[in-house]
Amino acid sequence: VFTFHHLKVDYKNGEKWSKEPFDFMKLKHLFTEWQEKMDQGGGWNALFWNNHDQPWALNRFGDTGKYREKSSEMLATAIHCMRGTPYIYMGEEIGMMDPHYSSIHDYVDVEAKNAFAALKQKGISDDEAFAIVKTKARDNSRVPMHWDDSKFAGFSESKPWLLPTDQDRINVEKELHEGEIFAYYQKLIKLRKHEQLISDGHIRMFLKDDPQIFAYERFLKDEAKKILVFTNFYG
């Protein structure tokens, strides 16, 4: 089952084109409800943060500055250890984030351009309208994969439809030699494959009212072995 409600927890009053911090408790409630009911009813969920129609999860739910790597690993842990099938969108395994565009003309997606025009018609200034569009534009995650630190990030020798902006410090080549995010994803995948209680087990949610911790445990029916997962979204 693919559900997208968790990617709307930063919509102000349900409005996509708004600039609003994400609602952690709402996100937590959604994950808790899906996990518990899927487990009880024998359902199976798709686990993901990113896709081609969303801005990068790291910008929405994590930290893109000092703690970019740890934040990327935290977000990965939160979903890869849950019950369901985890999906990795190209670039999240190296910590890619929204490009640093400075103009609506940097985007090509008609939805973003139309939203910018609609916001201006409401009397919102150009700068504020762009700031809003920048946080939700689909093109954010459609920038070519950062393979290396070359002008077009190793994607091509000619100018791509969207220009990369962080390839000098975030790229596959550098990540494989100096980074820690890709290696962490490998460890998560290996753990999931080797531990049946993660791939096939049940789930029990903890600290449901905690304002910054998302926690749960995984276990098999006999509960002879358990794995506790704690992820801190704010510290």
Regions found by a protein language model. Name each.
Residues 1-17, 21-25, 29-32, 66-235:
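Loop/helix patches that line or flank the sugar-binding groove of alpha-linked glycan CAZymes
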